[in-house]
């Protein structure tokens, strides 16, 4: 039980709760909405009488409350009243239960809302008074300040005057560090934070050497920005000026990592201050950074199109001041704010697996946010939601907010509806430390505390560095257009190093001459680096680069067939139910059917083919990760990768039961998110390439919820940054009359982004093809994302099956010729995916079919030579048709038509739905009519059935 504060009437004690205000200016207006939750004094008195007689019979929190009251009561000159006699009655004097409750209320109030009176905003000279923390509102009068009180759970339960208690509470909770933590439900976490900030009044305490290190680092950050500002006038660099203590925060975390057991950091951040972080945290050579500013700069051995300098990733091994090494990775990122967050979490999780870090203590993810993006971008909340989820947790992330209190030109009042930009972190009960960016020692203290919290509890924590932006959004921008008063104030702000130097001079930690010498030494170093750039023409591109150069894509066959005896091991595990396991009767029938099909070697469907691919890879030592909404069971109830006991819900994973030395199989039902989860799995695939990583959409239609991740990472990352991934995306796609939201994975959008062999895009028509495509991902010598237009109705289509021999021999086919072509066909129909079966079924009812049907299984990269070879026997057909279910402005038509024409010298005729704004009709009747017409048109026939 924790109290706010109490108000006494003649008969009732009120426990008062007040809603938190949106902004500091609204404290008084919000306070008018105060409501009281009435407590009858009899209940307190009754509990007190019980405590006097049998204290152990009460809840421990009541015991603490009454012990505190009793000690305080005695400490004010009263005689002890506690007795175990039935006639015991406490004498109620000046020091009453009510006053003790008010004291507890005051302590709680400062812990809860003390941050609203904090001095952590460097741009504010005066903090609006919060009336809820005034003496009278806390239930005291000036004459009470001299009374001695027992502090209960504050400061370990000591006796202090009310004045001393309030002074220390103000110093702790209303200073340059404001702490929000009472939203944490776990008592041990709240008490841990209290134990770290209350005994020292939340004030930094560093040794002489530590202070000098912090001073040197802040000077280093400032001199770097000053140098760029004067040497590269007007060039975009997204300066950190005004927020240089970001370097303090990151360096402090880095320095403490070895003490906390952290061996590796994976970090993500946007462009603001990125060059400074690269130079002064990551250790990237200033010489190389300066070289990138050259107008004629082209990296040696450049890969692809490249990207601007403040988007590039980097990795390094850094040595702390204590001589211990920490590996640091900075992820490449686009300008799309916060998009990299999920990627960082996935990379961190992958690196934890690589290190065998099951406790998730040795690899630390750090995310650097901007204040406007933190509150504005929905993916921030999605990534916070990873925090405690089995398939996505990373043992806690340290979030650092560069809160320069402006978003390009947007004020906080226009950027968010909450008091703080960090309020979103409360959804996972992350503690939040607001700190004054002009106080590097406080920033360093908070950074160390945040790291310790993460390591102790394995959960997220937020550092909100309140600072300012000295220039505009970029160096060519004039912020005075929209924030003239703010920037008049900013122009008068002293540099942080000046403030710290002044403080350290007063405390005898440095002299002005020593501080100036640090500045001079750093300037000389930067000048020397620039001189090298001007005189030395070449520099290694791969100094810390995260780019990966790989062999080009080629169409050489890949060995993907598997020996029958290996597949038998997989099938045995898939179709064996453990003794005593109460398996759902429907699943039991499914596995019995699977067993029969495998034994016969015929009728192997899509789900079984997938599991044979997974299992065979695992037997070869390749682990598999499958992640997505409902992926354990499968959206269409086809996979059942995990079984649950019908009586006690015991979990059983058949694919984990094959052999002792097999690869791992990790299948996770994801949170209901596309962007964050796809980003996570993409990041995972980057840093753990040994694993087959798969992300599955519930329906392909929903994949555009992750369009930023697709465009900025999956399709273009190799070209921009040399980032190599072989992530598989399963996107259920097909027109089956389910309406515009459950028909299309927007194939055309993926094909539009295809160039330079960046991805592989397939629309497969047989289970065996799917089997070989999955295995090919891990058996080829290059890595490319695989985008699969996955089936829905084909999962149970009687014709969409394969024979076992197709798995034990052969391999992937980019094109599949007609298995039963008519004699002398006059029409050649090219198609892909599900529509092939509609065409085949329709052709069966035609007496004298004249159309041959060839399937395109892989759209990109397009194997032109193989295409010509497969179509060779049909060169004399009079009519060449491309048939698709999608409207003309969608699907593969606009991508394939020019390729077909270039290969064959003939432009195909389009057969499909007319161009529409929406992918599909919502009417089942209209859908059937459209489907019937396009099938008939493709075959050059009228199909005699009402259902087509």
Where are these regions (language model features)?
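Flexible, glycine-rich loop/tail regions that form catalytic "lids" or insertion modules at the edges
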Residues: 98-108, 115-144, 148, 222, ...
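Cofactor-binding active-site loop characterized by glycine-rich and histidine/acidic residues
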Residues: 263-429, 433, 636-688
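Extended, charge-enriched "interface" segments that sit outside catalytic cores
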Residues: 32, 69-246, 262
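Active-site cores of enzymes that catalyze phosphoryl transfer or operate on phosphate-rich substrates
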Residues: 202-224, 295-345, 349-356, 654, ...
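Subset of Sec-pathway N-terminal targeting signals
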Residues: 26-69, 73
